[in-house]
Amino acid sequence: MTAPVLIESLDQEGRGVAHAEGKVIFIEGALPGEVVTYNAYRRKPSFELAQVGQILKPAFSRVTPECHHFGICGGCSMQHMDVRTQVAAKQRVLEDNLKHIGKVAPELVLPAVYGSPWGYRYRARLSVRYVAKKGGVLVGFHEKRSSFIADMQACRIMPPRISALIMPLRKLVESLSIRERLPQIEVSLGEDVDVLVLRILEPLTAQDETLLKAFADQHHVQLFLQTGGPQTAYPFYPEDAPELSYTLPEFDVTIPFHPTEFTQVNPMVNRILVRRALNLLDPRRGERIADLFCGLGNFTLPVARRGAQVVGYEGSAALVSRARQNSQRNGLAGSTRFMEANLFEIDESWMREQGDFDKMLIDPPREGAVAVVTALEEKQLKPWRIVYVSCNPATLARDASVLVHRNGYALKAAGVINMFPHTAHVESIALFEKARRQA
């Protein structure tokens, strides 16, 4: 057993940080202010990675995890701390990245956006494996630091009706002839239908099909089958199920989607995120606004509903087609355009060809949008306002540095969106502005 150490802070993965014998110790399951022992599982000359041992002095922010799989399952890493402490830690991660990577600081720290900490996950990719030693099939997330699948009976971060399906799914897969050739089940929930996408590597037998249909009827789900990449997923049973979609009621927008297309995992927080983004962007009638990495139109359509003319750019031809369909579905085709573009390779000449935009919204994947912000260098004073939605604080900070130090913008505000409670994932939003040309 190690000597007790004092936990000084949390790192970006939510691990407690301590110092001992000239090394930095990163301790999973430890909280700032606690005195703990630890069990190292990786030792390097300057640091160690460890699991918490005994908690000799607990922090006031420590709570009892509600899921008995916590600590083994890799789906969550922060259930041992109260939600406000989780969010405060994420806010520090955001501000530290902006300071140390971007050399910037927001003029205003926005209040954090919260949602329900339980039952929030409407999208999940569950691994499946037949394990003879376990006596059957496992369905769930991977164990921490492991390729093994956690032996899960339930999942508190998924809606109760889906959590309750884990054991029936295990029994279902075990009964199939292809139980060793079904590696993944993707969960995709809409407002009127719950979809499970089964990744299959061999054809089903007639008996398999009968078992799957009986499961779908009993548990009121629609089953898709996926034989290759995401684009190969197709409805298996029932084929006449309701359309998979989500709504943004504040903007009278309904967005249909395919179960393998990207949507936010947390629909309630997504509604709040869209509201905040539009409040910061403040679209006005007559303005021309760009929505980069627009996807299905999650932001594009609400912005258009406010009266602006919006051009959405997306790298996937399939998503561009879907976004156009969604704009027509919502009666917004006249105020929106959607264009395919590889936004990781654009430059200043491409940006000039698009014409002037009054404002811009950027919602990139984890890689960020460095090509976009670099291409804005020659745009003079337009767009004068940019709202940047980020799922990676490091790339946000890098891009913020370009916008502020090279392009003349000010970082007016930034804050976290707690899209993934109980995980270290940091979703955030930032507002950039530059002085407008005077008439």
Swiss-Prot record:
Entry-linked InterPro entries: 23S_rRNA_MeTrfase_RlmD, MeTrfase_TrmA_AS, MeTrfase_TrmA_CS, NA-bd_OB-fold, SAM-dependent_MTases_sf, TRAM_dom, U5_MeTrfase_fam
EC number: 2.1.1.190
Binding-site positions, [4Fe-4S] cluster: 67, 73, 76, 155
GO biological process: rRNA base methylation
Residues annotated as binding S-adenosyl-L-methionine: 264, 293, 298, 314, 342, 363
EC category: transferase
Residues annotated as domain TRAM: 1-54
Record field: catalytic activity: uridine(1939) in 23S rRNA + S-adenosyl-L-methionine = 5-methyluridine(1939) in 23S rRNA + S-adenosyl-L-homocysteine + H(+)
Active site: 391 (nucleophile)
Taxonomic superkingdom: Bacteria
GO molecular function, one term: rRNA (uridine-C5-)-methyltransferase activity
Sorted UniProt keywords: 4Fe-4S, Iron, Iron-sulfur, Metal-binding, Methyltransferase, rRNA processing, S-adenosyl-L-methionine, Transferase
Function: Catalyzes the formation of 5-methyl-uridine at position 1939 (m5U1939) in 23S rRNA.
Sequence similarity: Belongs to the class I-like SAM-binding methyltransferase superfamily. RNA M5U methyltransferase family. RlmD subfamily.
Xref: NCBIfam families: PRK13168.1
Protein name per Swiss-Prot or TrEMBL: 23S rRNA (uracil(1939)-C(5))-methyltransferase RlmD
Taxonomic lineage: Bacteria, Pseudomonadati, Pseudomonadota, Betaproteobacteria, Nitrosomonadales
